[in-house]
């Protein structure tokens, strides 16, 4: 057991690569100063000896990680990090929230790319962005990311980065709309959660739960789904529903987790009421075919992604 001191007031995430551990810290920048360190990514060896850090100053950031999370992936050479922030005050007097995408060289922890400015989805920018997931596909050298946006775009969106290693990710991202949301542009309520991104040999899987968006104004019950995107054609193949909770029922899905069990088996876990202390789960294959329909066991989920260890999901 070893205690690691907080390097900045906010702790935002942990990631393990083949050779290193990474911790992400941050601090608010209420004066909007370009000299304030807002994000620090610290590299450790597997004995938790500190080896280096990437430090981000200013970066158009008032509050790092605000209303979102941190997701990381690596290709052995680079660490890719997707998160979010509230930005410096805009001309309209508001501090708008949006996604951030970073690429960091693992060897020297140099920040190679940091997209923190106002942009659009053709450059992987989402605003507001309320959940972020990232995955590196080593078979194609591609980074995929998903976000839950409430305005630009107002959807569960998948993005693909192919020109990695360049200073500015100079090629534009290719985007797939997985699910469009009802309501007005910028309305924070979307009736949905998005959590989980996995890439297989032929597909990209992303999990979520949502109200019936076609009845946005009246629907209140969220159901769990897995979206299947064809990797070769890069288009949405289908959305597979894993629950069927009725509007007049008591069950209402909370944030699901997508967990890779093997190359062709994926678990989706969720809760409907934290007080019940029950975990719902189902299994699908790489094409989204249901291998085992919804079942329930005693337990609870944390805000950390479950992992597979010793033949069990924990």
Can you say where each PLM-predicted feature lies in the sequence?
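Extracellular, repeat-based ectodomains that mediate carbohydrate processing or recognition
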Residues: 1-314
């Amino acid at each position: 057991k070893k205690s690691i001191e907080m390097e900045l007031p906010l702790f935002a995430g942990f990631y393990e690569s083949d050779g290193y551990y990474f911790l992400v810290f941050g601090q608010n920048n209420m004066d909007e100063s370009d000299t304030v360190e807002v994000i620090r990514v610290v590299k450790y060896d597997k004995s938790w000896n500190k080896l280096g850090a990437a430090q981000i100053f200013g970066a158009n950031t008032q509050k790092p990680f605000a209303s979102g999370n941190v997701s990381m992936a690596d290709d052995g050479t680079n660490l890719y990090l997707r998160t979010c922030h509230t930005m410096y005050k805009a001309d309209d007097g508001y501090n708008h929230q949006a996604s951030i995408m970073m690429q960091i060289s693992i060897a020297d922890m140099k920040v190679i790319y940091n997209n923190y400015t106002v942009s659009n989805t053709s450059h992987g920018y989402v605003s507001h962005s309320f959940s972020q997931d990232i995955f590196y596909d080593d078979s194609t050298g591609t980074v995929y990311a998903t976000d839950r946006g409430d305005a630009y775009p107002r959807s569960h969106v998948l993005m693909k980065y192919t020109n990695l290693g360049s200073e500015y990710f100079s090629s534009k991202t290719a985007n797939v709309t997985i699910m469009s949301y009802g309501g007005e542009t910028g309305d924070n309520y979307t009736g949905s959660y998005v959590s989980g991104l996995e890439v297989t040999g032929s597909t990209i899987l992303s999990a979520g739960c949502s109200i019936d968006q076609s009845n946005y104004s009246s629907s209140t019950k969220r159901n769990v789904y897995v979206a299947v995107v064809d990797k070769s054609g890069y288009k949405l193949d289908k959305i597979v529903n894993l629950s069927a909770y009725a509007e007049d029922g008591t069950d209402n899905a909370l944030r699901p987790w997508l967990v890779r069990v093997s190359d062709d088996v994926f678990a989706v876990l969720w809760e409907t009421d934290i007080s019940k202390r029950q975990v719902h789960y189902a299994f699908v294959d790489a094409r989204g075919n249901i291998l085992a329909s919804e079942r329930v066991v005693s337990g609870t989920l944390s805000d950390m992604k479950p992992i597979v260890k010793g033949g069990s999901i924990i």
